Amino acid sequence: MVPYDKQEVVVVRQKQIGVDLNFEPPLRVGFGISDATIDGAKAVMGRTVLVPGAEANQTHYHTNNDVCWYIMSGNIRCISARSDMTARKEIILAAGDFVYVPSGSIHVIANASDTEEASLIFCYIGVPNVEASGFVWLTKEHDEFVRPRP
C-alpha cells in the first residue's frame, strides 16, 4: 500500500500530454500515466492513434513488462511471434477487444483500413516509464516480419 499522503486520485488530461509523433512512427502516441506525470507510478498508460492507412510500427518486444491493449475504435492488424521469431500469428483486432501481450512477445500493429482511423489504450504493467520497459527493436527483421503471408 502506498503511504497515506500519496493516496489521492490523479487525473491527467489529454491537453497536458500532447502527442508524440517520434516514439513509434507512424503511430501517434499520447503517454498519460508514467513517472513523468504521476509521482511513484508503477505503470505506463496512454493512447495510440493509427491514421487511415498507417503502416506497421517498428517490430519489437519488451523484456521487462507485459502489455495490455483495449481497442477503442477501428480495426488494427496485429502481427505477433515469440522472441525467437517462431509461432508467427496475424489477427485483425476490432473495437472492444482486450489484448494481452506477454513480455518477450514480438508485436507490431498497423491500421487495417485505408479510410478509417483506429485507436487503442495501452498499459505497460509494472514499469514506471518507457525506458524501463526494455524495448528490443528488431530493425533488420522488420520488413520480412510484417510482409503479408499467403
Model-predicted segments: where are they?
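Short strand-connecting beta-turns/loops that link adjacent beta-strands
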Residues: 38, 64, 114-116
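Double-stranded beta-helix
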Residues: 5, 83-85, 108-150
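Short acidic-glycine-tyrosine-enriched beta hairpin
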Residues: 82-103
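A short, N-terminal "cap"/entry segment at the start of jelly-roll beta-barrel domains
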Residues: 1-43, 58, 91, 135-150
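Short beta-strand His + acidic residue motifs that chelate non-heme Fe in jelly-roll/DSBH
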Residues: 57-60, 78-80, 101, 107-114
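Short, conserved beta-strand element in jelly-roll/cupin
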Residues: 47-51, 62-78, 82, 123-126
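Conserved hydrophobic/aromatic beta-strand scaffold that supports enzyme active sites
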Residues: 29-31, 45-49, 68, 90, ...
